[in-house]
Design a protein with these regions (language model features):
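Conserved C-terminal structural/oligomerization subdomain of aldehyde/semialdehyde dehydrogenase
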Residues: 2-3, 7-9, 38-39, 235, ...
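ALDH superfamily catalytic-core signature
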Residues: 11, 15, 175, 208-338, ...
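Residues at or immediately preceding the N-termini of alpha-helices
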Residues: 21, 40, 58, 242, ...
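Rossmann-like NAD(P) dinucleotide-binding subdomain of oxidoreductase/dehydrogenase enzymes
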Residues: 107-244, 358
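N-terminal Rossmann-like NAD(P)+-binding subdomain of aldehyde/semialdehyde dehydrogenases
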Residues: 1-116
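Residue-level signal for inorganic ion chemistry
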Residues: 43, 88, 149, 180, ...
């Protein structure tokens, strides 16, 4: 590990990666100190730049994701472009209001003081992106970072190399390159950047790496936002519209070959409707795959091996085929695998979907709450009370009734995990807040300047002060 001599003046190190990280952060810090990123106009220009980047260069983005992930242009538009534009437009619309200081009251003892709080940028921050939605999940956090007036280093995932190269090329073209930098590379450069004592690290990725990021940030007391994964469950009760449930679950699982952090990981289906539901699910999957190749490509050989490893020893209800040459796996449904099988342990993150029979909603909730708190939890039911039970009895990042993943697309809602699925939240105003410090300000008048406030305190002074407090 390399160290940097002084946070504000100079950097000396022998490792070229560490030198690049140190020089970049030093340069951005100097820019931040000039106040360049503070005005509303600068922030708005960056947000407009992000919108222009993804809309004007949509075809280049789509080509990159076809190469990295085997995605169709439509999936790129839906998953990475429309989602980014929605976030940026919302921030543009509300930013002026978010930046205004908010007046608050004061207790009697502080009257007639004037109290307020305002959002102050943290300084120079680091956004570490994953490979599964490489544009939305780097530009989305960047929207929060620039809206809040920060300088930012973006570190895209090396596992989506074409997308990483596009970001490195286009971000300087569309955004202020004095204040926003892209550094490509793997874990080493990430660690070297963290060693620069960033003012915040915003990480999206898996839980294990998230822990390493938090550990690396701890010695510097760098705050972290961790957007992690987990096993997001879906309950289907006997009161569900089974056709709608099957279509929406199939849609959520097939999107990006199941490599979506809020994809359905496993289903908990009431026994009395499981056969009928499984038939609907099979039909929905085959209808949605009409005209598409039998198997879905996954990101790389390592993920392919991990996923096919999960299939070993299971008896698929549908699917189960895989092709190593094209690193593609057929969407696969497995009914009632052993709960100790690997497929029911870690996050699946691929086109494999286990269904577990449950006796009741109580049973389903008990199973979910035995595990770590998931990033998302879903229920399909027409019963208001059943929906309310999921919302109130299952601790998780976010909960949705009768759909999959749609909460992600509402900038009016905070998005983030809890426990092993993450800490901190973003989207909309929460993104702006995540990259800001809430600074308290209190303006006191010089008069009156009551003697009773200062020692020595007479009996009478003490009585009055106790009444005022
Ligand atoms: P990952 O954890 O492998 O990597 C993410 C980033 O961390 C990459 O940029 C990588 O270079 C960097 N990295 C890897 N090892 C590192 C180390 N030792 N030190 C420092 N940096 C390191 O995640 P991934 O495989 O790209 O993404 C998949 C995971 O992300 C899944 O678990 C998924 O659920 C989760 N995810 C969460 C969200 C969310 O919003 N909560 C969104 C998408 C994906």
């Amino acid at each position: 590990m390399t160290s940097v001599a002084d946070r504000s003046t100079e950097s000396t190190t022998t490792d070229p990666g560490a030198q690049l990280a140190a020089d970049t952060v030093l340069r951005l810090r100097a820019v931040h100190r000039t106040g360049r990123t503070l005005p509303l106009e600068w922030r708005k220009r960056q947000l407009e730049g992000i919108i222009r980047l993804v809309t004007e260069r949509e075809s280049e983005l789509a080509e990159a994701l076809a190469s990295d992930l085997g995605r169709t242009p439509h999936e790129t538009w839906f998953g990475d472009i429309a989602s980014t534009v929605g976030e940026a437009e919302y921030a543009l619309k509300h930013l002026k209001k978010w930046m205004k200081p908010t007046r608050t009251g004061v207790p009697l003892a502080l009257m007639p003081g004037k109290a307020s709080y305002r959002y102050e940028p943290l300084g120079t921050v680091l956004v570490i992106g994953p490979w599964n939605y490489p544009f939305y999940l780097t530009l989305g956090p960047l929207i929060g970072a620039v809206a809040a007036g920060n300088c930012c280093v973006v570190k895209p995932s090396e596992h989506a190399p074409a997308a990483s190269a596009v970001l490195a090329r286009l971000i300087p073209e569309y955004l202020d390159s004095e204040a926003i930098a892209v550094l490509e590379g793997d874990a080493a450069i990430t660690q070297q950047l963290i060693d620069q004592k960033m003012d915040l690290v915003f990480f999206t990725g898996g839980t294990e790496i998230g822990r390493k990021i938090a550990e690396a940030c701890a010695p510097h007391l760098t705050p972290v936002v961790l957007e992690l994964g987990g096993k997001s469950p879906v309950i289907v009760t006997k009161n569900a519209d089974l056709g709608v449930a099957a279509r929406r679950i199939a849609f959520g699982k097939l999107l990006n070959s199941g490599q979506t952090c809020v994809a359905p990981d496993y289903l908990l289906v009431e026994k009395s409707v499981r056969e009928e539901f499984a038939a609907e699910l099979k039909k929905a999957m085959s209808d949605m795959r009409a005209g598409a190749p039998e198997k879905q490509r996954v990101v790389n050989e390592r993920q392919f091996q991990r996923l096919t490893g999960l299939l070993k020893g299971l008896k698929p209800e549908t699917g189960g085929n895989a092709d190593e040459t094209s690193i593609a796996i057929e969407p696969t449904v497995v009914v009632n695998p052993d709960r100790t099988a690997p497929v029911m342990q870690g996050e699946i993150f691929g086109p494999i979907l286990p269904i577990i029979d449950v006796d009741s909603l109580d049973h389903a909730i008990a199973i979910i709450n035995e595990g770590e708190k998931p990033l998302a939890a879903y229920i399909f039911s027409k019963s208001k009370s059943e929906i309310e039970r999921l919302f109130s009895e299952v601790p998780c990042g976010g909960a949705v009734a009768n759909h999959i993943a749609m909460h992600v697309l509402a900038p009016q809602l905070p998005f983030g995990g809890v426990g092993y699925s993450g800490m901190g939240a973003y989207h909309g105003k929460w993104g702006y807040e995540a990259f800001s410090h809430r600074k308290a300000t209190l303006k006191m008048p010089t008069k009156p300047d009551l003697k009773l406030m200062y020692p020595p305190y007479s009996e009478r002074d003490q009585k009055i002060l106790r009444k005022l407090a």
